[in-house]
């Protein structure tokens, strides 16, 4: 009877467990971040999830489809976490500092620039647009916080979109690695403090 209720070809679901598609995406995110786009196969994802390769292909016809959804879901979660941090009653500077630390803890061991460059050559224009839209959501969360801070006279009047792009540009330095794969600063706390101080002193006009 249960077999008849689900669409033909759809993998069986255990109602008490996390949805299979969610499990696939979560494992794919980790594998892609750890190993890069090219080195991860659909078989790797299936084995990591404890499902068949056919199950992965049921939800995602191609690796590019899986990668796109994995990255979109990851950015949506980041946006939600950013919004949660920025919604606290603390100052913008304190909230941004906390957000930078959360970001760096999640990505400190990853060369994000090389990671995204490697993957983008394999994606269609539509898939790239999906990722760009998700990325824009992250920017919007920060931009809204910047706008509120300007209205509350917490930071000087200026273009909140410019402030936002400046913030993300400086934030990306946290993922910089030299030829020996070493970061500029040895600890996440020190990196976060340097990023925030540089950004804050810049928009506040301090020299």
Q: Locations of the language-model features?
A:
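C-terminal peripheral helix-coil segments that are non-catalytic and often amphipathic
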Residues: 1-8, 140, 144-152, 169-177, ...
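Hydrophobic alpha-helical connector segments
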Residues: 69, 83-109, 163-167
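Helix-turn-helix/winged-helix DNA-binding modules
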Residues: 34-37, 58, 152
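Short hydrophobic/aromatic patch on the recognition helix
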Residues: 49-60
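Short, basic, alpha-helical segments at the C-terminal edge of helix-turn-helix-like DNA-binding modules
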Residues: 72-78
């Amino acid at each position: 009877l249960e077999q008849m209720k689900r669409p033909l070809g759809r993998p069986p679901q255990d109602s008490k467990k996390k949805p299979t598609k969610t499990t696939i995406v979560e494992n794919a995110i980790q594998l892609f971040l750890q190993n890069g786009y090219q080195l991860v196969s659909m078989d790797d994802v299936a084995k990591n999830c404890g499902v068949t390769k056919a199950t992965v292909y049921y939800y995602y016809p191609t690796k590019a489809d899986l990668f796109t959804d994995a990255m979109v879901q990851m950015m949506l979660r980041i946006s939600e976490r950013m919004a949660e941090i920025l919604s606290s009653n603390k100052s913008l500077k304190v909230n941004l500092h906390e957000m930078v630390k959360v970001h760096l803890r999640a990505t400190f061991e990853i060369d994000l620039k090389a990671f995204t460059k490697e993957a983008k050559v394999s994606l269609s224009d539509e898939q790239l647009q999906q990722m760009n839209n998700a990325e824009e959501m992250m920017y919007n969360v920060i931009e809204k916080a910047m706008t509120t801070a300007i209205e509350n006279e917490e930071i000087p009047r200026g273009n909140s979109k410019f402030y936002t792009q400046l913030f993300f540009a400086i934030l990306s330095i946290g993922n910089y690695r030299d030829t020996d794969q070493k970061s500029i600063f040895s600890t996440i706390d020190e990196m976060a403090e340097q990023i925030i101080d540089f950004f804050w002193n810049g928009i506040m006009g301090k020299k």
